[in-house]
Amino acid sequence: DRDSCVDKSRCQKYGPYGQCTDCCKKAGHTGGTCIYFKCKCGAESGR
């Protein structure tokens, strides 16, 4: 889920990050972005 992606995907302060995006996609989101070193998932896909 969204929170597990935050825990697994440490990242730079801002911008896209591969692990973050991949984690979010597996969780059913369209992708993810890094905000203040945390992975934030985008809108859910296919719902």
Swiss-Prot record:
Annotated InterPro entries: Ergtoxin, Scorpion_toxin-like_sf
Subcellular location: Secreted
Tissues of expression: Expressed by the venom gland.
Function: Reversibly blocks Kv11/ERG potassium channels.
Molecular function via GO: potassium channel inhibitor activity; toxin activity
Disulphide bridges, residue numbers: 5-23, 11-34, 20-39, 24-41
GO cellular component: extracellular region
Protein name: Potassium channel toxin gamma-KTx 5.2
Family stated for the protein in its record: Belongs to the ergtoxin family. Gamma-KTx 5 subfamily.
Sorted UniProt keywords: Disulfide bond, Ion channel impairing toxin, Knottin, Neurotoxin, Potassium channel impairing toxin, Secreted, Toxin, Voltage-gated potassium channel impairing toxin
Organism: Centruroides gracilis (Slenderbrown scorpion)
Domain notes from UniProt: The presence of a 'disulfide through disulfide knot' structurally defines this protein as a knottin. Has the CSalpha/beta fold, which comprises one or two short alpha helices connected to anti-parallel beta-sheets stabilized by three or four disulfide bonds.
Broad class of where this protein is predominantly found: secreted
